[in-house]
Amino acid sequence: MTRAIRSVLFGAMLAAGLATCGAPAGGSTSGTLQVIAGENFWGSIAAQLGGSHVAVTSIVNNPNTDPHEYESSATDARAFATADYVILNGAGYDDWGQRLLSGNPSQRRELLTVADLLNKKAGDNPHFWYKPDWIERVADRITADYKALDAADAAYYSRQRETFRSALKPYHDAIAHIRSTYSGVPVGSTESIFVYEAQALGLNLISPPAFMQAISEGNGPPAQTVAEFQDQLTHHQVKVLIYNTQTSTPITDNLKQLAAQNNIPVVGISETIQPTTASFQDWQTKQLDALQAALSRQ
């Protein structure tokens, strides 16, 4: 289970008030689908798949904060109240969004909860956007949902899907290159964000699972896992350390420093897109290029 996601109560109260006052529950008079994404990684994908036929608002997009701790606002409530389509990550990552949906019931609004699509639940690792196969699966589902919401433009959404498939090629190529060149290389990660991608890359993620999960949930990791992680670094069992730039703690900062002291490259990766103007695939490919460069030094 990820760390508790706090939600501002007045946001839900305002959402209920909006519904009572007759604000539209969903639908757009302009012919453009109003899409709300809980996080900007799903928002980037949704925008590319919808093109000029959608207007996408991503709620969580600040690269300087921990998305696990996001607090919803009155502005978020208004956005949810008028959305045609909402995309949430699920699995406890953005429970604030579920509460805003409950405060704004609508028969017109469609919802995609990625965790449900992938048969995942609260307590499972929620970093689904770090698994390449699941990106394609989510993209297929968003495309199908757009077609259902806007059947007259189904052919347009099919073309957008193919364009996005082509745009993902450098991302998939970077993954394939690392997998073919560095399969089995032992690496470490300060948090569970890298678990799915390590599997896709064929890397051997040897960090204590209980440590990574505790950091992801905002808890103090068991002392024995901290000692084990430190030993892995001081004995050079880890060739590269992956560091989550958005969930840093004194313990993870210490591990980052310990890696540097032992000449182990550190590669930072983030929960949300950085910079915020980048596309999903450019953000991911840049991180993969940095990882490949670090691996090449070992």
Protein language model features and the residues they cover:
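Sec-dependent bacterial lipoprotein signal peptides
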Residues: M1-A19
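Extracytoplasmic metal-acquisition and chelation regions
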Residues: G17-Q298
